[in-house]
Amino acid sequence: MTTILKHLPVGQRIGIAFSGGLDTSAALLWMRQKGAVPYAYTANLGQPDEDDYDAIPRRAMEYGAENARLIDCRKQLVAEGIAAIQCGAFHNTTGGLTYFNTTPLGRAVTGTMLVAAMKEDGVNIWGDGSTYKGNDIERFYRYGLLTNAELQIYKPWLDTDFIDELGGRHEMSEFMIACGFDYKMSVEKAYSTDSNMLGATHEAKDLEFLNSSVKIVNPIMGVKFWDENVKIPAEEVTVRFEQGHPVALNGKTFSDDVELMLEANRIGGRHGLGMSDQIENRIIEAKSRGIYEAPGMALLHIAYERLLTGIHNEDTIEQYHAHGRQLGRLLYQGRWFDSQALMLRDGLQRWVASQITGEVTLELRRGNDYSILNTVSDNLTYKPERLTMEKGDSVFSPDDRIGQLTMRNLDITDTREKLFGYAQSGLLSASSATGLPQVENLENKGK
């Protein structure tokens, strides 16, 4: 069976991931006119730039959908977001600022839940708006086929007939108007935005040029913290975790995790927390650039890692970071539910997150400027009395440290011998200044 269909399957049911925007509206109407039977599926991901979710399925029916459904994905999305925080599943960082993989998390949820809904309706052909140059076409492909082994893929944007007729936004707008729908193109922004409850992605157009900075972006989850005219008073916030799960903000508990994430977004968003500018490697290895918002994810991540460093030992923390980066890359590639990802997630959640219980108090200022004011946990292995510089009882004595240092003589002697061995083989050069062999000055190489 052909998995990817290059041309419209006339007379067959096609499920389309319907956003209500110009692209998917024109595609749905065009498919109906050409003889297909479109079914529209809209994911409610708590997008901060969407005002009326219920209106989207109604518009789909007006444009010719055989049926239109709104699928509430918010609970599952937040669950996956918290799992990513517990595992540190983030691999793109620049100068200490993190991209929280909010789009990959959204695709994992959308790609499975929408296809599951289609399967319930007997719809086994799926189309969406992802382009052939991006990451989403592969993410949706993987998640769709994982959910429904009989799934076939039809994308209007890969169909030459559709492209020839409606290849651009102007043509799509004219097509909608000609069909009796007063669909005017929205005002073109200098960049494209995609969002869900966990975060927003701004990319493309002017942002493809590296001399266009974050300053051209209008945040949809935060504030322009770089604008000195925007007043942002400092604010204290306390985050509480129990066994790796965020349970309270400023002492307030919530009826569900969706409400907690919304409040975390509001708190972090007031300061522009969690915005970052990243150059990243797409799945196809080409580099792209994005500016990201994730105020709630950032707030929870900061508090979680503060507790992590106070509770776990150095080797565990090292494995958390190494495995988290590996897991973050798998998530980015659309492999969040693959066996290698599940293996990493299980270990990180079982042995790391389960011990993260306590409270962290932060002072948030502008952007990613914050201070940690207090850290409280019954599980802390940080115990200041062990290393206090004040006179008093200690868990070890000066004689104990002398013995420990004496044992170091073994590897110090071995290292010294290796250094002189490297010098004899020409890998290092002698140094009169230190008495130890040195790496040769690069300026002198080749002279």
Swiss-Prot record:
Binding site for L-citrulline: 99, 135, 139, 192, 201, 203, 280
One GO location term (cellular component): cytoplasm
Keyword Cytoplasm: yes
SUPFAM superfamilies (alphabetical): Adenine nucleotide alpha hydrolases-like, Argininosuccinate synthetase, C-terminal domain
Reactions it catalyzes: L-citrulline + L-aspartate + ATP = 2-(N(omega)-L-arginino)succinate + AMP + diphosphate + H(+)
Predominant localisation class: cytoplasm
Entry-linked HAMAP family: Arg_succ_synth_type2
Protein name: Argininosuccinate synthase
Native source organism of the sequence: Citrobacter koseri (strain ATCC BAA-895 / CDC 4225-83 / SGSC4696)
